Amino acid sequence: MRSENILQILMESKYTVAMCGIQMLFENGYPGLRDGDVSYDIEQKYGYSAEEILSSTFYATRKELFFDFYKKEMLEPTKIPPGKGFINLQKLEEYGLVQAEITRRLFGLLDRAGCKHAINMHGSVYENFCTHCGKEYSMEYIMEAEGIPLCQECKNPVRPKICLFGEMVDNGIVTKAAEEIQKADVLLVLGTGLHAALCHQLIQYYTGDKLILVTNEEHFSDKLANVLIYSRVDDALEKIVKAYQKKIKEKQKMEKIGHE
């Protein structure tokens, strides 16, 4: 389907929600810590898998190694700014074509791109708190701390406000995401599959008939989408944004002619 046709669907929509998957991270240059060579390198370097280290049990029992891994493998990549996929999604929000974004990714790329209505299901590395008194800390505080970051007030550990493996996702956040999807007449699934965890958990709440899937990986569940685009997400969103900008310029030109 042409970008102009997708744009028309978005322009006719009263409420569109975007669900953003891991492919958008990869397109942005972020590593897949549980994939292929990267996963192997992590096990060789730390003696454990990323999933083991980023668990509630590991955090409770091996904080020193947890934070060594966390600073190097989770915080270092944040030096990479949001790429054109996230920037163009923010533009669609700004144009009133997308009303909310939902992701399970932890790097805050939607917020950093300027999206005002992002729901970070599993939290963000940019939010941290003292496990004892609740005092909040920046990501920079975690990064600059030697070893285990400690609260300036009570000297207890400061931990990232993210959902570790073995922890339950905050029920309030799940409810908020479900409510957004229930309101949607268009669901824009970007860079993930309908079988993946993000969709599997939330897609049951969508009651519309305009599910648009943009992905670069084929899967048999793709047939459940009403509109299917095999493409990089950043390329697809860029085309939609350009189509909208072209449409607006043409409209402004016609209005100018009408006033002459």
Per-region residue spans from a language model:
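Conserved catalytic core of sirtuin-type NAD+-dependent deacylases
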Residues: M1-E260
